[in-house]
């Protein structure tokens, strides 16, 4: 009886853990294409100020607020997040490979890792890998980068629309940019989702140099 009960509990535990595991990635659809066809995925030239609303779902907690991104091509961005009701704020600066997110834990939960943050802005910048597989399906180009796969990128035309971080054949984190001015970041293991809705995007002449220091 004890062995049977122990076996049942163990099986149930394994099922629960399997249900919590990040999803496995499927094989890329479409026809093979040369890796040289992979778009560059760069930021638009110049400087832009982007205003957005954000919502963070982290377990049972939901937070909302407003934010501003100050973007300077080719490789600099400052993000400021303001919690609804004026109850807090956070900031991050990403310049090239250097990401600074000082302050409380909430700020770090609002900011994806470096490569995914760049992807949220439309810039394709992942660590170099020896193996890249590119396939095209119905005009959509997808690329698996690394062997085993570490990154999966999706392009519509020359525009980066989705970037996924993969580990052990499972989807760990992803960022998706849609045509309706929405951006979503999802951490599958942490069950955390950040959604942005862009309110405005304006070209500006310059930024005060002090914004790059936190």
Spans of model-derived segments:
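Gly/Pro-enriched, hydrophobic low-complexity segments
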Residues: 134-214
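Extended lipid/amphipathic-ligand handling interfaces
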Residues: 67-71, 92-98, 173-177
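N-terminal leader/targeting segments and the immediate start of mature chains
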Residues: 20-76, 86, 104-106, 129-132, ...
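A mature extracytoplasmic/lumenal domain signature
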Residues: 81-85, 94-98, 103-105, 167, ...
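Local beta-strand/beta-hairpin segments that build beta-sheet-rich folds
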Residues: 87-91, 150
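Acidic/charged, solvent-exposed loop-and-adjacent secondary-structure segments enriched in E/D, K/R, S/T
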Residues: 99-131
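Sec-dependent bacterial lipoprotein signal peptides
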Residues: 1-20
């Amino acid at each position: 009886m004890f062995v049977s009960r122990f076996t049942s509990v163990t099986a149930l535990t394994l099922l629960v853990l399997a249900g919590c595991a990040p999803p496995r990635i499927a094989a890329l659809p479409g026809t093979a294409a040369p890796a040289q066809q992979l778009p560059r995925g760069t930021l638009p030239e110049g400087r832009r100020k982007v205003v957005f609303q954000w919502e963070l779902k982290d377990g049972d907690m939901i937070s909302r607020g407003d934010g501003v991104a100050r973007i300077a091509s080719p490789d600099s961005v400052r993000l400021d997040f303001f919690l609804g009701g004026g109850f807090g704020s956070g900031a991050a600066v990403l310049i090239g490979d250097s990401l600074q997110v000082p302050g409380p834990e909430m700020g770090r939960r609002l900011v994806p890792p470096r490569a995914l943050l760049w992807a949220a802005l439309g810039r394709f910048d992942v660590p170099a890998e020896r193996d890249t597989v590119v396939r095209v399906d119905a005009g959509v180009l997808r690329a698996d980068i690394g062997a085993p796969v570490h990154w999966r990128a999706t392009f519509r035309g020359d525009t980066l629309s989705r970037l996924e971080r993969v580990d052990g054949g499972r989807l760990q984190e992803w960022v998706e940019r849609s045509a309706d001015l929405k951006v979503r970041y999802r951490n599958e293991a942490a069950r955390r989702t950040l959604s942005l809705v862009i309110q405005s995007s304006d070209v500006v002449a310059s930024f005060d140099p002090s914004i790059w220091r936190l």
